């Protein structure tokens, strides 16, 4: 391989790397799990996080140690000296708080010592609030009141105020921990925090992740300064300016060259949020829907115009002159599916046998299943069933419970895709990524519910892949647009809708919507 381009995804449960060559072919993938890796077990996380009621965090130093481990692995396997570009992404919305003087430590990194050794004391907040946190209801209400309500916040920033969004999380620290705030020199998103490590100075926040903070004017793509002043008079100086996601942030710091052998002219692009990076990795066409099936489930698609919706999000697009990315995020994804599997004492490779015990439509057994407080709809955790009690469904009919979970998740995705205004065409497809994209039963239900073919990408991890693809694109200096350069040819057809099931789900969807409308009013 002559030239390599590295994409990295710092997600909730793991850090994942994908390397592509000069032709765009995936040549290497690797992943490190935060909770199960021998060197990271000491942090005591469960699925990468610490939970204390509605407060959900991850240790910053755990991420840094994982990055150390990842790059040691890449060096030992002979990949680092071939890298020409690096980019990537991180779980969206989470914030990292650098102590006063921390940038000096970044600039002076010593190649004889690990990152963790040198940066452990550089953070005023040791455990970063992440996207799963729901402890900021008070701050959300105050922010929305300030701008004139949830609809006005959505018109201004692309989303109503959400618990996990950075504005509410920052305001909570300003309100409750003034001493910590005074000791904070810089606030990074997790994405710009990662880029900062690579370039040896504070990296700027880029537009796609910046649009997921409730602080950026989505139309002008500039910070909304009245919101800054409402939170804290010094917030603007601690966040810095915004940068376009396809603009180079410079080359790797000499630390990475001397310690890991990365060429000194290796370019670093801004790191995105994981969902916009998945959009880049999937190379979606305007007629496609992207669905990421992970700890959380997300549905996203390209939209040429800005249409605010309090139930969804609109983010800036990573590519110039490409409109917006519409998205809805469901907090309860893979962990709820795993609960259904465990209730049936099954493994995923035998899951189709469990699902075949019940028919499509589940004899009209419907439920809403939230292991954590849900984002959309904004409802507390719990199992909400209608045709029979939750306990009866789980104890007497675990197979019906399992199908109810899977079908409910798919029906929610259809409901909110319609709310976001997606227009289906004859050539529309669903492109699925994430850990559950290998679950053929789930993919078939999605296909039947949406009445669309479902495709998967050839490599697991579209978010990391998106970082590598963007890096290669910028390095090429091509005059083609991103979609021209990457014509979405790295996908495989997984399943087609089954006409008999389509009819069943069309009828079930009407009942589902009725149950949903009643549920929302409660």
UniProtKB/Swiss-Prot annotation:
Keywords for this protein: Kinase, Transferase
Pfam families reported for this sequence: FGGY_C (PF02782), FGGY_N (PF00370)
GO process annotations (BP): D-xylose metabolic process; xylulose metabolic process
Gene Ontology CC terms, in alphabetical order: cytosol
Presence of the UniProt keyword Ubl conjugation in the record: no
UniProt entry tagged with the keyword Repeat: no
EC number per UniProt: 2.7.1.-
Enzyme kind, highest EC tier: transferase
Molecular function in Gene Ontology: D-xylulokinase activity
Family (UniProt): Belongs to the FGGY kinase family.
Protein name listed in UniProt: Uncharacterized sugar kinase R08D7.7
